[in-house]
């Protein structure tokens, strides 16, 4: 393990976080809030520590995949610890455990909250909560690689370790250029949503924070009722953008380039949109009597399906009161998640496709034992390593899920609450059902259960392995 280079990169991460943390200070100045001093203190602390480490140049350039995974995992933990400090210092969230839970939930774009009264927070704290979604949505290392000329051949290791999905590719030969393209698309889409929300009558502060949550598919709201208080036009705009941010960003790159036709041929996007359409249709029919007309039922069904499958977590209504069939459909799409290469969480549609095709292949062998069938994605054969990786991910995911469920069950809450709490955190969704539903919160859990759920949030956002490697002794051996 090359500790010096990991420490050097962590220095850059803290420096970048300090720059981000100065923005809530500006918000505090605008609203004349004394809570902004907490952000200023922590921002200066991050900057001082970061600059001290950056100044110490590292000579060794040895950097393998394991260094990439460990660096990313440690970066997200350290970012969350420092990101939680302003909440504790300004007393918006006095408990460090609760503040850390809220911050990890923000950076991992989960949106699970321990707060019962969100509106009691200062504007600068509300802004930071939502801004952590935007930072975490695309990933801090994508941002880092886009603006800094990091050298040494380890850029791709960092990007692969942080990016959501079975694999991450390069749109162009250089990793740094790929990072720039990703962030350019991300920023433009965020700005377009802000403008549309403003034009629909949403106040500027609300437009900014809601757009940050939508872009990062996070779901922290600034109102206790989430998105329910806004008009249907605003809700419809958010619905559309949640779906757009759940699409593989490769599709947008293809649309901007000379391969526009290929963008519409992406198999994962077809499955993603088909699943959304099917889920919306089922829930619309199932809830039409609740909402008294088909259009209103469709409106809420579209919003909640978009919110859940993209793992955003916003809500326009208390879907925990919906019929059992509708609730079951939402739980299913919680697991499926968005597309790989998007800002969404969950298992990912691409993995679901590979799992389904693997099962189909195995069934085919029972009928025709001597047949040779190749699993394809976008008409391209998948390697045995890719298929094995998906299967290993699914097994690891299941083991973490079961272990987490068993541990938090010691708090003695009902099974639906516990099951959906793990589902909501491991898939980075936010709200679950029952006590952790749209009108509930995660403050009910004990400190031990909260730390387990924090682990789940980090594991889910980083695709399991970076966090798990931290607990592997052999990883920490020096080269």
Residue ranges and their predicted role:
Residues 1-479:
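Membrane-proximal intracellular helices of multi-pass ion channels
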């Amino acid at each position: 393990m090359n500790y010096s280079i990991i420490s050097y990169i962590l220095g850059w991460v803290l420096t970048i976080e300090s720059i981000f943390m100065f923005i809530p200070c500006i918000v505090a100045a605008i609203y004349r809030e004394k809570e902004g001093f907490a952000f200023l203190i922590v921002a200066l602390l991050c900057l001082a520590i970061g600059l001290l480490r950056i100044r110490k140049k590292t000579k060794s350039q040895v950097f393998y995949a394991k260094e990439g995974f460990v660096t990313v995992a440690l970066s997200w933990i350290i970012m969350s610890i420092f990101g939680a400090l302003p909440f504790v210092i300004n007393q918006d969230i006095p408990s460090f455990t609760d503040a850390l839970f809220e911050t990890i939930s923000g950076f991992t774009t989960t949106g699970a909250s321990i707060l019962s009264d969100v509106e009691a927070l200062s504007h600068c704290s509300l802004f930071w909560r939502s801004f952590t979604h935007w930072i975490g949505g695309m990933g801090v290392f994508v941002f880092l690689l886009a603006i800094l000329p990091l050298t040494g051949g380890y850029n791709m290791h960092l990007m692969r370790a942080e990016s959501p999905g079975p694999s991450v590719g390069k749109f162009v030969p250089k990793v740094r250029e790929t990072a720039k393209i990703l962030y350019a698309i991300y920023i433009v889409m965020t700005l377009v949503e802000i403008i549309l929300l403003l034009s629909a009558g949403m106040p500027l502060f609300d437009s900014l924070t809601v757009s940050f949550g939508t872009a990062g598919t996070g779901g922290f709201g600034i109102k206790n009722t989430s998105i329910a208080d806004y008009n249907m036009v605003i809700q419809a705009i958010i619905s559309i953008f949640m779906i757009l941010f759940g699409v593989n960003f490769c599709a947008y790159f293809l649309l901007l380039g000379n391969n526009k036709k290929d963008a519409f041929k992406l198999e994962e996007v077809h499955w993603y949109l088909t699943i959304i359409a099917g889920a919306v249709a089922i829930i619309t029919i199932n809830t039409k009597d609740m909402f008294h007309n088909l259009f209103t039922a469709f409106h809420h069904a579209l919003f909640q399906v978009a919110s859940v499958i993209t793992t955003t977590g916003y809500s326009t209504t208390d879907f925990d009161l919906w019929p059992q069939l509708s609730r079951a459909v939402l739980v299913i799409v919680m697991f499926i998640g968005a597309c790989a290469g998007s800002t969404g969480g969950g298992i990912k549609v691409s993995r679901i496709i590979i799992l389904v095709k693997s099962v189909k292949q195995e069934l085919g062998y029972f009928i025709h034992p001597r047949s040779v069938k190749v699993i394809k994605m976008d008409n391209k054969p998948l390697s045995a390593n890719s298929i094995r990786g998906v299967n290993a991910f699914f097994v690891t995911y299941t083991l973490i899920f079961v272990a987490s469920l068993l541990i938090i069950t010691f708090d003695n809450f009902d099974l639906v609450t516990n099951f959906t709490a793990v589902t909501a955190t491991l898939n980075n969704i936010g709200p679950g059902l029952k006590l952790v539903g749209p009108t509930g919160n995660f403050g009910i859990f004990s400190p031990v259960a909260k730390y387990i759920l924090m682990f789940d949030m980090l594991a889910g956002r980083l695709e399991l392995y970076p966090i798990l490697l931290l607990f592997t002794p052999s990883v920490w051996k020096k080269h």
